[in-house]
A protein has these predicted regions:
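Amphipathic, Lys/Arg-enriched alpha-helical "gate/interface" segment within cytosolic domains
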Residues: 2-137
Length: 137
């Protein structure tokens, strides 16, 4: 993420592995919640999704830009069900969301999550492309 920076305090080292995966970053002067599911197994995916929802729910409605990276993530049935419910629960807080890293069978899960949540989350081939789209007015 070339022109992006993490918006966090120096206590980064004290963050849990889950909290390190869900952080606000800044891209071209705009705040984006980066939810990093990359290489997560099903258990970690659920924990990351829960942390993402916790942070989103602290923000005003329809205010948050989100970037979700699912590169190399693996899912089980329970994780998919949980992810569907979290994406739906996050909807009131998200102004715009994007996804990167969708490959192979992940496309089926991506379509199922969108259908269940009734949200359209465009997918991009790179984080940079997604960030550019998110911050455009």
């Amino acid at each position: 993420m070339n022109s992006s920076q993490v918006l966090s305090d120096p206590s980064q080292a004290t963050l849990t592995p889950v909290a390190r995966r869900v952080q606000f970053i800044e891209h071209l002067g705009k705040k984006v919640l980066f939810i990093n599911y990359a290489d997560c197994g099903a258990t970690m995916m659920k924990a990351v999704a829960g942390e993402g929802h916790r942070l989103l729910s602290l923000e005003p409605p329809n205010s948050v830009l989100t970037l979700n990276d699912v590169t190399g993530a693996t899912f089980d049935h329970e994780a998919v069900a949980f992810l569907k419910s979290m994406v739906a629960a996050n909807a009131p807080f998200v102004r715009r969301g994007a996804v990167v890293g969708i490959n192979g069978l992940q496309s089926l899960i991506y379509e199922a999550v969108q259908a269940f949540s009734r949200r359209k989350l465009p997918q991009f081939t790179s984080r940079e492309q997604a960030l550019q789209w998110l911050v455009q007015d």
